[in-house]
Amino acid sequence: MTQELSFQKFIEQSDLLGELKYDFNEKDEFRHTETQRPFVFNYYENVLEKNSKRYQALGHLLEQYIYELLEKVCKLEKVYIPPEADKEEPRSFFFMSEKALTNHHSALLILLQDHGVFRAGQWSQQAIIHHGLQHGSQIPCIQMALQAHYDVIVLNPNDNFVEPKVEKEWKGLLTQNIESSSLKMVQGGSFFSLQHPPKCIPKRCSNTPEEHTAYIWDYFISKTEGKDIAFIVHGYGGLVFMDLLVRRRWEVMSKVYAVALIDSEHHVGHQLGSDVQLLAWIKHHCREWVTSPKPLDKPAATVFKKEFPMVSAGTEKYILAPSSSLQSIFKYFKKALKARTTINFSRMPIVTRSSTKRKQSA
């Protein structure tokens, strides 16, 4: 995956080579370039603030690196929203495959991540650093989908605002030694100082994960005709999907054939209430994979969640649940799509010789 694009080049350009001598090896694991050991947080011995800033700088570099992989390895297109916004205006964006909106002969897969500091293309920043790209990034999922002839849209629900001071300080981190820039950040009362939070500039149409998702649904996804749509949602993404279902019920119910939820944070009682139609729809179109000591796919329902089938993700680690359940999820999609196609075909009018004659004589 990483042969085409080295993460070390990003670090070299940032002038943080002394503090971050890391790259992804042939197994896509994040390792020290000299010792081949896993990432060590405590680089500055027992200096929490400096180690935290180093970790945040690493997270920012990983964010940009994953964006590059989405475009250059997965061949996805970066789409800014809203399209009419001036280039100087803070804008959000998402990624999609080349013919995601126009290819009527393939299903469309939409990825909706958990809430956190990470951005499009990541299930978990922590999983990327400690378990590698195969487990923490969305790239294996995207590649699997493309190989199965899905089109793909990768949402970016956590890209909600710009912090002017932080933007300048990131540039400082990316052009200066981290020790000297850390001092400037503390003196300046920056983002990293709890006493002086920065003023945030919200990104239009993407103030929240819910708004980001609804906007892309309204202005992009809903415009597709004849597309069978599936969602993979993780954590808070499950709550965001249920919000979309409530807001755009008829469109979502007619277009979406399957939803794979992973350790979802949705709340059916609060979000769907006692709506009989919505409850019936999720029962037949949703399945959830949850962290569990049970083997993958074994039933794992709880007394709190019984609204649709729940199975084990095959792991007890939250950050590994998406990668652990991926093969099972695609099997579920294949079966659900086949069932949807069969139902649609069975509802088509059967043209007989007698019906043709009646039509001609009418």
Swiss-Prot record:
One of its GO terms (biological process) is regulatory ncRNA-mediated heterochromatin formation. This is Putative protein ARB2BP. Belongs to the ARB2 family. It is found in: Membrane. It is a single-pass membrane protein. The chain crosses the membrane at residues 229-245. GO terms for cellular component: membrane; nucleus. The keyword Signal does not apply. The keyword Membrane applies. It comes from the Eukaryota. It comes from Homo sapiens. Keywords: Membrane, Transmembrane, Transmembrane helix.
